[in-house]
Amino acid sequence: MKRILAISAIGILTLSGCLKEDSRSYLTQEQAFTSAQNLYINSVALLYGYIGGSGDSQGLQGTCRGVYDYNTMTTDEAMIPIRGGDWYDGGLWENMYQHKWTSSDASLYETWKYLYKVVMLCNQSLADLQAYSHLASEDEIRSWTSEVRAVRALFYFYIMDMFGRVPLVTAADVPVSDVVQSERSEVMRFVYDELTEVLPHLAPERSNRQGKWYGRITRPVAWFLMAKIALNAEVYADDDWTDGIRPDGSQVMFEVDGIQMNAWEACTSLCDKLESFGYLLEPVYSDNFLVHNEGSVENVFTIPLDKNLYRNQFWYLFRSRHYSHGGALGGASENGTSATIHTMEVYGYGTPGQDARFVHNFYAGEVFIDGSQVMLHTGEPLVYMPMELKVNLTGSPYEKTAGARMAKYEVDRKSFSDGRQPDNDIVLFRYADALLMKAEAQVRNGADGSDA
C-alpha cells in the first residue's frame, strides 16, 4: 500500500512543520521523496505539526482535554468548576480535579492515541530516512535522524510521565502481537539515552527564535528535558509505586559528557549547560508571554503560533474569561478555568506580601479594558471572586464569577477565533524552571541550593 504524504509550500520557507495543509498538495510516497528538501519536509518537518494542535486532546499545550489539562486540572493549581448548567460535561472536570478518572475516560484515551500516533509517525520517519538516504548527504541524514529520535524521545517522555508502564515501540512495522508493556524505568532510560546519543548531532541553537531552528528540538531543548528526567528519577525509576518504597536519587546514575553522576548531580550539570549557553531570566517577567515573544532570553522551547500561517491554537485565555470579559475584548469566551484557592494562598493574594507577579498571571476583582470597567449584562460591574471557588458552584451567588482567571499571556487584540489563534508562542520550557530544578537538585544532594 502506498502511503499518502502532504507537502506544504509554506513549510519549505518556515521549516517549522506546523502549517495548514493544502489538500491539492497530496502526493504518493514515491512522488514525495524525490529530493533532499522533500525528504526533510516529509520525514522531519511534518512531525512538528503535532507538537501544537487545534482540536481536543491534540498538542502538548494549547488545546483542551489533553496533555495540558491532565497535568494541570488534576493538581492544586487550577480547576474548572461546575457553574450551574455549565461545565458539568459528564463529570469530566470534577473527576479530573478529584482524581476520579478511570480507564474508560474518553479524553484520556484520545490523549493516549495522540501521543502514540506521533511516536509511530517518528518510527515511520526513521524508516523513510533510511530508505531514501541516497537523496541527502551523510551529515544531513545523521542530523535529521537525530532530530526525529529527539522528537520521539520528547513524546515518550510525556507518555512515560503520564501513564507509567507503557509499550516501548521503536520500529514502524512491529506486529501488534509483539507489543508488550515496558517498565517505567526502562522507558525513562530509553528517553534519556536517546537524547544522550543524539545530542552531539542536534543544532547548538536557540529554538525559540525565528529562523531555521524555530520551534525545533535543538541541543538546549534536549538538555532541559534530560534535566527534568534526572530531577524526577526517583519517581520514574520506581516500577512498583504501590509499596511505599522509592529509589534514592543519589543512587540513580546518569551519564553527562561521558561522566557517571547521580540524578541530582546530573540535573545540576545539565541546568548549568543552559546557563553557559546564555539563557537568562527575562528582566521583565511578562515579556516572556508577549504577543511577539520570540525575542525572550528565557524561553527555551515554544510552540510557534502565527494566526496567518499555523493552525495551532491557544484556548486557555478564551476558556477562562467571563463572557462579558471576552465581549469587552471584541470576542467571546467560555467562563471556565479558575485558579484554585491554594494557588491564591501561594501568591499571597490580598495580603501585604502578595507576589508582584500575581497581576501578570491572574484577573481578580474588577476588570478594566482600555480604561473602561467591564460590566455584566445586568449592568453591574464584573468582579471576579478568587476565594469563593469550589468544585460545584451551582446555586452560589458567585456561580459565574468565582475564581481568579488566567492572564499571563498578553492579549492579542488582532487574534482570530475569539482569541484562540493569537501570535503569542506557547511557552513549554523556560530557563526559570531550569533554575528551580537546579536548586531542588542541589538541596536533595545535600547543599542549600543558594547558588542556583
Predicted features along the sequence, with ranges:
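Polar, glycine-rich mid-to-C-terminal structural blocks
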Residues: 232-234, 266-350
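Short coil/turn linking the two alpha-helices of tandem helical-hairpin repeats
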Residues: 158-162, 167, 206, 232-239, ...
